Amino acid sequence: MILASFLSEWVKLKRKTLLLSTFLGLAAASALFVVLIFSNAPAHGTGGGLPSLQQLARPNGLVFGLTRATFLLGVVAFGTAAAQTASEYSLGTLRQLLVRQPRRATLLAGKMIAVVTFMMLATAFAAVVAFLVANAMAQSRGVSTSAWFTGAGLGDLFNALGNIELAVIGYSILGLVIGQFLRSAVAAVIVGFAWLLVIEQFILTRIVPGAAPWLPGISLSTIAGGGNADFGITYGHGLIVAVSYLVVAIAAASITFARRDVTA
């Protein structure tokens, strides 16, 4: 059953070293983004692309810090997911899992759902910490928070958090797939980070400047931001492109996993 595979994967995910480092690391990074935004926000206008204190007092001011940290959350989700999948091969534990659960599609589905759930919970925890820090920083900078807790403010909050969680799901699935193909945690993380941090930017600046709407990393960041004004990409377009990539990736990983020999 998928539930058994899900619970089996959680035995590994809930180890203190992984759980604490992921949850606390994401929370600290998100809190840092919030502190930097509030500390450097000018009273009026914009400063280096940062929102002003007046903008932070608007209904969507509570989510500024977390949305700026989305790419970091996605990169961590990708790396964690890739490492969890690839390590099954490098440590030789996959063969033991297949003895207990020979239905490979069921095993893969349970593992994917478990890792995605883990990263969603880590992101939610980071969001809670970021929101608490945002309230504290608002008080220190004299920013009114009354608009944050209006109907519009709470709507913006849940909408932003939902978009960020969707993006994290996408990053996690791509990490799982890359880890499945490469079977090496180090190689999977390096390849994924290189694509997200370097290769996509190289494609845009050196090869195909107009390719932004069709790249997976930018599509996921578009979802997280509710659209991408820099490249003129709508939320709907980013969602369609990202889902298309994920469907193809999951199908390819499923076929490969079902047919690949496991000798260790």
Q: Each PLM stretch: what is its role?
A:
Residues 17-19, 103-105, 109, 184-186:
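Membrane-helix interface segments
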Residues 241-264:
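Junction motif at the cytosolic side of a transmembrane helix
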Residues 40-45, 86-89, 93, 133, ...:
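Membrane-interfacial segments
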Residues 19, 23-84, 108-180, 198, ...:
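Secretory targeting signals
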Residues 1-28, 183:
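Aromatic- and glycine-rich beta-strand/loop motifs that create alpha-glucan
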Residues 78-105:
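Transmembrane helix boundary and interhelical loop/hinge segments in multi-pass membrane proteins
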Residues 32-39, 182-218:
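Transmembrane helix segments
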Residues 12, 86, 97-99, 175, ...:
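Helix-capping/transition residues at the boundaries of transmembrane alpha-helices
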